[in-house]
């Protein structure tokens, strides 16, 4: 079966102002397009396609790159080769997809990947045979078909658990990045952790018409960071788990700060801020990860093997991967701790 792109009108603005005005005019019936390596395959599968596409490929304001700011339109190949940005960010970019895809795919596109699920990322005919799903055209989640509501087990027509599979999001969150959004209502800046919110459908705090324009990085002097990825293959595949860490050590080897972030585990990236400065909201249920529950006190302690294992055990205990991407949740849950231990050991030196 050949999957063809549906008909849509392509718009090519050359400035943010022009793009935002187009969005205002088109209302609800459009998508922004950057590299198109995720959006267009979804369109071919009939997944939430719109009648208009606004290409941001010719907006020069989105392509700047410096040690403290990266434009959303910077392609992943340029990130991979850059000597200006933290080496861990360049490495994470190099782990995405393939060299050919990285020539087109962008930072903004990777951070705003649509969530993925066995029951969603299929052809229209496959999904129609099953009866569709909550994320597209249906009214029930097939991954978790029953959910507790008001003390009763009811059909899950409320919560989508599709997985957010960005490689760059967990690392940038671990580094404490912020993002800038420009839209019809003006410009605003959010912590990257605040940008991600909700379930597998409503996964961004993004107002209609807003454009994700850039990521800003705090000073990384003295900050050690890294990223590890689990995937079925070393090329092409989305992560089924990503673990990032950023830490600061004093001269005595004691932890001054530690942030661990998980990707491809939940509907949004999960942050473990062991300093307690930035706490991810309690999900209020047992479906999603609560990184703060039982978090050990580790700041001010020497980062020895025992402390590293304690941190890794906490990540393993609390991680809640779902059965909706390749590899079993139990294995991915265990590997979350294994990767955390390996990363912290490497970063300790």
Where are these regions (language model features)?
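C-terminal structural segment of proteins
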Residues: 1-349
């Amino acid at each position: 079966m050949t999957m063809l792109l549906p008909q849509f009108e392509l718009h090519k603005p050359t400035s943010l102002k022009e793009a935002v005005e187009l969005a205002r005019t088109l209302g609800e019936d459009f998508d922004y397009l950057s590299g198109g390596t995720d959006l267009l395959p979804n369109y071919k599968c009939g997944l939430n396609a719109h009648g208009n596409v606004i290409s941001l490929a010719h907006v020069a304001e989105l392509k700047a790159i410096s040690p403290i700011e990266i434009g959303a339109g910077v392609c992943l190949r340029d990130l991979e080769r850059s000597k200006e940005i933290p080496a861990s960010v360049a490495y994470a970019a190099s782990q995405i997809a393939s060299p050919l895809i990285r020539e087109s795919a962008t930072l903004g596109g990777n951070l705003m990947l649509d969530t993925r699920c066995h029951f969603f990322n299929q052809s229209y005919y496959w999904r129609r045979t099953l009866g569709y799903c909550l994320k597209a055209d249906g009214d029930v989640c097939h991954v978790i078909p029953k959910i507790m509501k008001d003390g009763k087990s009811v059909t899950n027509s409320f919560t989508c658990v599709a997985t957010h599979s960005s490689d760059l999001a967990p690392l940038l969150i671990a580094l404490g990045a912020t993002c800038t959004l420009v839209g019809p209502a003006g410009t605003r800046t959010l912590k990257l952790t605040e940008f991600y919110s909700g379930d597998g459908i409503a996964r961004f705090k993004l107002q209609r018409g807003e454009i994700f324009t850039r990521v800003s990085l705090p000073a990384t002097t003295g900050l050690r960071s890294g990223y590890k990825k689990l995937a079925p293959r070393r090329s092409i595949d989305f992560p089924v788990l990503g673990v990032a860490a950023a830490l600061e050590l004093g001269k005595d080897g004691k932890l001054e700060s530690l942030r661990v972030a998980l990707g491809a585990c939940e509907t949004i990236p999960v942050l473990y801020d062991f300093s307690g400065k930035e706490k991810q909201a309690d999900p209020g249920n047992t479906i999603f990860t609560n990184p703060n529950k039982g978090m050990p006190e580790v700041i001010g302690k020497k980062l020895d093997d025992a402390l590293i294992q304690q941190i890794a055990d906490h990540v393993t205990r609390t991680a809640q991967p779902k059965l909706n991407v390749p590899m079993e949740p139990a294995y991915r849950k265990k590997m979350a701790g294994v990767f955390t231990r390996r990363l912290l050991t490497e970063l300790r030196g």
